[in-house]
Amino acid sequence: MANDQVILLDYWPSMFGMRTKMALAEKGVKYEYKETDPWVKTPLLIEMNPIHKKIPVLIHNGKPICESLIQLEYIDEVWSDASPILPSDPYQKSRARFWAEFIDKKFYDPSWKVWATMGEEHAAVKKELLEHFKTLETELGDKPYYGGEVFGYLDIALMGYYSWFKAMEKFGEFSIETEFPILTTWTKRCLERESVVKALADSDRIIEYVYVLRKKFGAA
């Protein structure tokens, strides 16, 4: 694997790309990072992801792997000699996949709509977002990590969103630390890992980016 060529097409605010960077760091994989603005469909992005034309795209020896959750599994299988990401137990693995899908299918929409909407729609979105935060906190329970004692797949899946938490709080007018103390303790534990810290974007910079997006989409 020492001679492998690994390239990551990503955009700095992408929570999905942050996941992939965490996984690569956990495995100690060296890679070339190529900043790729998703609003500008570069020839390389179109070539590597012709169906969706979205980032992140992981390119391993010229072969593209799309979708962040798929990338996590790919990274875990290819670089299997260090820091397992997915549980080995089939049942626990299925649960991790279930909850990761919950994050992207249920949590994702209100996580950005909370800063992109106003009025009654905003109130409904905020309510939905808080319910999903509570669901995720309940699933965590008293475990150090979502997979138990070991940092892994589901932790990476949710921590990818961490850089956006502050924007969610600001525009949603709520406090994660106050309303979800167990989840807050978990985030602090995850932030002790170098792989996580180095993968995350600056939260204040994300807020500045949100203002740009609000203006772009007429939500300012």
From Swiss-Prot:
* An example Gene Ontology biological process: glutathione metabolic process
- What does the record give as the reaction this protein catalyses? RX + glutathione = an S-substituted glutathione + a halide anion + H(+)
Broad enzyme group: transferase
Q: Which CDD domains match?
A: GST_C_Tau, GST_N_Tau
Give the function comment from the record.
In vitro, possesses glutathione S-transferase activity toward 1-chloro-2,4-dinitrobenzene (CDNB). May be involved in the conjugation of reduced glutathione to a wide number of exogenous and endogenous hydrophobic electrophiles and have a detoxification role against certain herbicides.
- Cite the GO molecular-function annotations of the record: glutathione transferase activity
| UniProt-listed Enzyme Commission number(s) | 2.5.1.18
Per the UniProt entry, the signal peptide is none
Recorded hits in Pfam families, A to Z, give: GST_C_2, GST_N
Keywords in alphabetical order, please: Cytoplasm, Detoxification, Stress response, Transferase
Q: Does the keyword Cytoplasm apply?
A: yes
Q: Which residues form the GST C-terminal domain?
A: 89-210
Provide one Gene Ontology cellular component: cytoplasm
Q: List the disulfide bonds.
A: none
Family, as annotated: Belongs to the GST superfamily. Tau family.
Q: Which residues bind glutathione?
A: 14-15, 40-41, 54-55, 67-68
Which protein are we looking at?
Glutathione S-transferase U26
Q: What induces it?
A: By alachlor, metolachlor and benoxacor.
Highest rank taxon of the organism: Eukaryota
Is-annotated flag, keyword Ligase? no
Please list the residue ranges annotated as the GST N-terminal domain.
4-83
Q: Where in the cell is it found?
A: Cytoplasm, Cytosol
